[in-house]
C-alpha cells in the first residue's frame, strides 16, 4: 500500500512536469529529490506511530483502577508484536548452512557432527587413563558460507584453583591453539588446513573461554553432572543448593529487568521524539529548487536524532542477553539409595518472564514493551551407582 502510494505521488509529479513542459536536465537531482520525499514519508509514518502509542498510553493512564480500559489497536504501520528490543536482534543456532546441492548439505552436516566429536575428544585428552585437564567444552557452533567455515565453541576451566593442574591446562591450551592455528603460525599440518581438504573451503576454529560457569547452559549442565552424585544420597536439595550458592550470582532479577527495559524504552522514546522534531523542522524549511541547500539541511538534522544521548554507550545499552535473570535445574532419576525409587527435584531462582507490566501500571491486556525471553535449555543424562538420572538446565538472559 505504501509503495503504491509512493508510485502515485511520483506519477503525479511526472504528469505535472509534462503538462508544464518542464525539462529536467539533471537526472541526479530528480532522483535525490524522490529519495528525500521517501524519507519524509517514513518520518511521517514514525510520527503517526508514536502519536498512536502515546494516545493509547495516555488513555490507559487516565483509566482508574477497576475500570474497563479502551483498547486502541495499532495498524500494520505500528509496532508489530509490541516488541521493545527491535534494534538488536540475535538468533540462536548451532549450525547455519545453505547449499544448492542437497547431498552436499547432508555431507556437511555429517562432517559437522564428526568435527564436534573430534574437538570434544581433543579437549578431554587422557594420558595413562587420567585426565590431564579439567576443561568442559560446549557444543560447536558452525557457520557456513560459500568459501568459509567458522567453528566456534565455548570452554571452561573447571580446575582453575589448583596451581599444578592449572599449569597443565595452560600448557595443554597453548598446544591446542598451535594445533588449531589460533596463533597464526601458518603451519601446514594444523587442524584448520586439514579440515579445509574435507570441506573444500577455508576453515577457522574459534575457541572462547568463559570466566563463569553459568554463561552457557551446555557447560553448566555438564559441570553439575561431573560432580560426585553419590555423596548427595541423604538429600540433593540442601547439598546442591549450597554448591550452587558458591558459583551462581546473587540474582536481583526484578531490578535488573526493570532497569534494562526502562533504559531501552528511554532510548527509543528519545530517538522517536528527535525524529518527530526532525520532521517538523523539515516541514518548516522553505521548499526551493536548490537541491544542495535542502540536502545539507536534511543531513544536518539527521545527525540530531541522537540528541541528549551518549552515542558511545548506546551499543552496550541495547546489547541483548548480557544479564542472567533466572535459572532452574531439574533432577530426575535415581538420585538416592532409597529403595531405588525414582525422584524429581526442581531448583528455581529468578524469573523467566521479561514483561514490563510486572512492575509498571500498564494493564495486562496490553503487554507492551517486553523483551522476548531467551530460554537456554540443555539436557544431560548420566549414571551413578543407584541408576540413571537426568539433569535439565534452563537459563534466562536479558
Curated annotation (Swiss-Prot):
GO MF assignments: structural constituent of ribosome
UniProt-annotated location(s): Mitochondrion
Any GO BP annotation: mitochondrial translation
Pfam families in UniProt: VAR1 (PF05316)
Keywords: Mitochondrion, Ribonucleoprotein, Ribosomal protein
Taxonomic superkingdom: Eukaryota
Disulfide bonds: none
One GO CC annotation: mitochondrial small ribosomal subunit
Record's function text: Component of the mitochondrial ribosome (mitoribosome), a dedicated translation machinery responsible for the synthesis of mitochondrial genome-encoded proteins, including at least some of the essential transmembrane subunits of the mitochondrial respiratory chain. The mitoribosomes are attached to the mitochondrial inner membrane and translation products are cotranslationally integrated into the membrane. uS3m is essential for mitochondrial protein synthesis and required for the maturation of small ribosomal subunits.
Assembly, per entry: Component of the mitochondrial small ribosomal subunit (mt-SSU). Mature yeast 74S mitochondrial ribosomes consist of a small (37S) and a large (54S) subunit. The 37S small subunit contains a 15S ribosomal RNA (15S mt-rRNA) and 34 different proteins. The 54S large subunit contains a 21S rRNA (21S mt-rRNA) and 46 different proteins. uS3m, uS4m and uS5m form the narrow entry site of the mRNA channel.
Family statement: Belongs to the universal ribosomal protein uS3 family.
Protein's UniProt name: Small ribosomal subunit protein uS3m
